[in-house]
UniProtKB/Swiss-Prot annotation:
It is found in: Nucleus. This is Putative zinc finger protein F44E2.7. Its main location: nucleus. SMART domains: ZnF_C2H2. It comes from Caenorhabditis elegans. One of its GO terms (cellular component) is nucleus. The lineage of its organism: Eukaryota, Metazoa, Ecdysozoa, Nematoda, Chromadorea. It comes from the Eukaryota.
Length: 471
């Protein structure tokens, strides 16, 4: 590599006059810059604008020869053998003057001993190699991404299996603990039941032994007069029942026995209610059972009986019964109040009901008269009210009616007889009310009544002696 001489550099620096015929001006058609040297123009096109096609055209054979550069040995031998008539004449400027005029451009100068430029085929090969390398890199990245995803999926599945196994183990542990707890509870319950059963058996044995001792002592201490009174009463009722010549008396006896049983049942199916001060001014209903009524909800009707209206509210409007009351009146004065207790069976018909509403509907339809009539507090009542309160949505519906008792001429009868047609019959035989008014008979005394008067005992002893000695 030959460095430009100092004389050439000094001439450029001192701006030595040059022959105008040797000056050339080159204009850049990209940026408009004007250059006086062809080599500088070519370097400007290559460095600044990178115009390869223009540089290839500008670097002609003559220029290469002028600069002392050759394409190849074959090219130089071909140029020696062939002369070109259209070749550009050689520049009068010496070869030294065409060297670079600056130290910065010195290292960019192309010399003869350097390697030639790469050809187009090398560029294409380099492009293909770059594309192949990029494709290889892309495939490598894709393979790495695929491996990473597979590894992540494998780890995720392994974690899920671990979690499922932990959950199953926890469930098994809880089930085992629950089973052990239930087994222990059953053992404790069985032991407690056995202890309770043993204690109950011991208590029953003690009660039975005490009862046997007390019963034996009571039997020994019973008075002779009470035994004779019981025998006399039982024999008297047996004689009345066995007397076939008096069917009216027999029927009345049966009726009185039924009434006593009904009174006992009626006393068990109701409970007493306090008469609060505001109820003292209560008056009986004006309407009876058979007065037609309209529904207060749908305004439909008329309903000719209280039972039909009650069933209409229950079945059509799904109203629930809240309470059922009996009110006894002596004239217009309130003398008693009873609440019908909710039950799951009827004590008269021995019928069981799945719901309370069925029990109340059955009582209203079949037994309300005898249930009210048999109340002991209503013995002096002349009429009574039956009042039902039903809950419909957010309000309470009050239904009720009044019925009157028949005034019986004989006050010694146990119960008053209703008017014909008011009380539905609950037996197969229908009794004549007139026969019940004529005959008068005392009720059998209960076994619980132990206190007897001295006069009655004396009379019973005389009757027993007379029965033993009829003559």
């Amino acid at each position: 590599m030959v460095k430009p001489t100092s004389s050439l550099l000094q001439r450029y620096k001192n701006n030595v006059r040059v022959d105008p015929s040797t000056l050339n001006h080159y204009l850049c058609y990209y940026c408009g810059k004007t250059l006086s040297d062809r080599l500088e123009y070519q370097q400007h096109m290559l460095k600044v604008h990178e115009v390869m096609s223009q540089s290839y055209q500008l670097w002609s054979d003559h220029t290469m020869d002028t600069l002392g550069l050759i394409w190849s040995e074959s090219k130089r031998s071909y140029d020696r053998d062939t002369s070109c008539s259209l070749s550009v004449p050689a520049s009068p400027m010496s070869r030294e003057s065409r060297n670079r005029n600056s130290d910065d451009d010195y290292y960019d100068y192309v010399y003869e001993d350097e390697k030639p430029k790469r050809r187009r085929i090398d560029v294409e090969q380099s492009r293909r190699s770059v594309a192949a390398a990029a494709e290889k890199h892309r495939k490598l990245l894709e393979e790495q991404r695929r491996k990473a995803e597979a590894e992540y999926e494998r780890k995720r599945k392994a974690d899920e299996k671990k979690k499922e196994k932990a959950i199953k183990d926890e469930e098994k542990r809880k089930a085992e603990d629950l089973r052990k707890c239930l087994q222990l509870q059953q053992q404790k319950t069985a032991a407690a039941a056995q202890i309770r059963e043993t204690a109950e058996k011991a208590a029953v044995a003690r009660r039975m032994s005490t009862f046997e001792v007390g019963e034996s002592s009571e039997q020994l201490a019973k008075p002779e007069g009470e035994k004779r009174k019981r025998r006399r009463t039982e024999s008297r009722w047996r004689e009345i029942e066995s007397d076939s010549d008096k069917p009216e008396v027999t029927a009345l006896v049966k009726k009185i026995l039924e009434e006593s049983k009904k009174k006992e049942a009626s006393s068990q199916e109701v409970e007493d209610a306090d008469l609060v001060p505001e109820l003292s001014t209560r008056k009986p209903y004006d309407n009876t059972e058979h007065v037609s009524k309209l529904c207060k909800v749908c305004k439909k009707g008329p309903h000719y009986t209280f039972a039909n209206l009650f069933e209409h509210y229950q079945d059509l409007h799904n109203a629930t019964i809240k309470s059922l009351h009996y009110y006894g009146f002596n004239g217009n004065k309130l003398i008693g109040k009873k609440n019908l207790i909710e039950r799951d069976h009827c004590q008269r018909c021995v019928i069981k009901f799945p719901r309370a509403r069925d029990y109340f509907a059955h009582m209203i339809k079949h037994h309300v008269y005898e249930s009210v009539r048999c109340q002991l507090d209503f013995e002096n009542a002349t009429n009574a009210d039956v009042e039902a309160r039903m809950m419909f949505r957010d309000r309470i519906l009050t239904l009720g009616y009044n019925f009157k008792f028949e005034q019986v001429a004989d006050p010694n009868l146990v119960s008053d007889v209703l008017e014909p047609g008011q009380e539905p019959s609950t037996s197969a035989e229908q009794e004549d009310p007139s026969s019940l008014k004529i005959v008068k008979l005392e009720e059998p005394e209960l076994e619980e009544q132990k206190a007897l008067k001295p006069e009655s005992e004396a009379m019973e002893q005389q009757e027993d002696v007379h029965s033993l000695n009829p003559e």
